[in-house]
């Protein structure tokens, strides 16, 4: 059964022969060409699942061919073959939309694996997704049960102007939820004003919130409206409300009770109609117990509580969020959006993400710029992501997380200049497997050999080689 169609274009007949033989042996249907013009002629009647093109060819070179193919068949993955001296050209190929590049001389198994990835990616693009990704203009993405609860609350409050308190760790998207609450409310056409309590010096918070009269303090040369007046008729979002000083909390409570306030240095009351949405990453109940937050203000704000889960509690959303952020980053940078290899998606879902959705978004921006190929592989992920990926208790590790951790170890070792990684890693891997199998069989060697897929003589030899006799 054919697994896909691969086309090969190279003016070197030996390269064409080697690749055709390897890919045909892997179950692919192959067609070879000597020039880019031959490929373009063939594309008028049929289309492969992947094209491998040399970068240096007489007449039309690989980059010119790539450019024309992307204009006619933008989804067709093109793998550029290049000598080591052509790395600058390979970068240009990525910029023009190459799926990946294959450096010469290449390992034939790696070449087949790369072609397989490209074909899988292409064929997946041809099939409709069960759950279409929200466009980059969509505000909140989430299919996890905890996020569905958030959506239900937003829906139920769509006809209300009641106060809402949003709880969640930093980076979980509290301001996005506040925007959504405003946009789906009767106040949607009125202003949405946001103010971060933690970002304002304490001596300026009152002026920011309530405004000031001319001459109220040094530098107050004109009358200034505060955030409450700016948000009149709409919504005022007070982020990090837990950092609000106690004296300002008292004034805020009065505004919420009376609907009016005085500007700093003013004597005439200012009446406003404002909906308050507050957010914090702190435990406000604990702040109340510690005397750092007014209990009456807490109850005034805590009419409806929305809890935003950390990213580690909604792992099923991570692949979709990552694809969404890759689309946004590509749009911002004016490039084609990167694609995630399935193993990369799995690796992302295993990570701790202490910075939550914001950290994932920044990672996707980084990958859009720094990932080598059009498809993001696990080795493309920044190494610092894995520093928090290993659980304190090894028994908590997911079944296939060892592969990601092994890849990360190899990446660090290579960056440090290590060589002969296989000779270093293989004995440790075999020792671990042997120890585990022998423990599982209570030291019964023949049974341990069977579990490992070895013969008894092989196990005996390994025990001797590894000094485990």
UniProtKB/Swiss-Prot annotation:
It is found in: Cytoplasm. One of its GO terms (biological process) is nitrogen fixation. The keyword Nucleotide-binding applies. The keyword ATP-binding applies. ATP binds at residues 168-175, 231-240. The gene is ntrC. One of its GO terms (molecular function) is ATP hydrolysis activity. Gene3D superfamilies: 1.10.8.60, 3.40.50.2300, Homeodomain-like, P-loop containing nucleotide triphosphate hydrolases. It holds the Pfam family Response_reg. The modification 4-aspartylphosphate is found at residue 54. Residues 140-369 form the Sigma-54 factor interaction domain. This is DNA-binding transcriptional regulator NtrC.
């Amino acid at each position: 059964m054919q697994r896909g169609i691969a086309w090969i274009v190279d003016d070197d007949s030996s390269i064409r022969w080697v690749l055709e033989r390897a890919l045909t042996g892997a179950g692919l249907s192959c067609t070879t060409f000597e020039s880019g013009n031959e490929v373009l002629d063939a594309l008028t009647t049929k289309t492969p699942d992947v094209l491998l093109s040399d970068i240096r060819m007489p007449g039309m070179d690989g980059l010119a061919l790539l450019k024309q193919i992307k204009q006619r068949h933008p989804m067709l993955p093109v793998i550029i073959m290049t000598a080591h001296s052509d790395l600058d050209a390979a970068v240009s190929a990525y910029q023009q939309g190459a799926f990946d590049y294959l450096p010469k001389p290449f390992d034939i198994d790696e070449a087949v694996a790369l072609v397989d990835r490209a074909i899988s990616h292409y064929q997946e693009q041809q099939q409709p997704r069960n759950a279409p990704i929200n466009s980059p203009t969509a505000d909140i993405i989430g299919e996890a049960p905890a996020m569905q609860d958030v959506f239900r609350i937003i829906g139920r409050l769509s006809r209300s102007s009641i106060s809402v308190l949003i709880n969640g760790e930093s980076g979980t998207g509290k301001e996005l939820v506040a925007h959504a609450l405003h946009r789906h409310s009767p106040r949607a056409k009125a202003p949405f004003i946001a103010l971060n309590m933690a970002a304002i010096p304490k001596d300026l918070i009152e002026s920011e919130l309530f405004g000031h009269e001319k001459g109220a303090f040094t530098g107050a040369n004109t009358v200034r409206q505060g955030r409450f007046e700016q948000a009149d008729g709409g919504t005022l979002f007070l982020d990090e409300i837990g950092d609000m000083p106690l004296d300002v909390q008292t004034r805020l409570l009065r505004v919420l009770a009376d609907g009016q306030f005085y500007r700093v240095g003013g004597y005439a009351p200012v009446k406003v109609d404002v909906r308050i949405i507050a957010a914090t990453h702190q435990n406000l109940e604990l702040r109340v117990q510690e005397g750092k937050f007014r209990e009456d203000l807490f109850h005034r704000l805590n009419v409806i509580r929305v809890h935003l889960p950390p990213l580690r509690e909604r792992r099923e959303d991570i692949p979709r969020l990552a694809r969404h952020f890759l689309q946004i980053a590509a749009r911002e940078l004016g490039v084609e959006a990167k694609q995630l290899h399935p193993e990369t998606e799995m690796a992302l879902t295993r990570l701790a993400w202490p910075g939550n959705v914001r950290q994932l978004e920044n990672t996707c921006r980084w990958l859009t710029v720094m990932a080598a190929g059009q498809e993001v592989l696990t080795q493309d992920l920044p190494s610092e992501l894995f520093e928090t990926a290993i659980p304190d208790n090894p028994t908590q590790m997911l079944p296939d997380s060892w592969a990601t951790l092994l890849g990360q170890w190899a990446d660090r070792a290579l960056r440090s200049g290590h060589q002969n990684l296989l000779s270093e890693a293989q004995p440790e891997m075999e020792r671990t497997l042997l120890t585990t199998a022998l423990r599982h069989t209570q030291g019964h060697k023949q049974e341990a050999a069977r579990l490992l897929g070895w013969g008894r003589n092989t196990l005996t030899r390994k025990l001797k080689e590894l000094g485990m006799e």
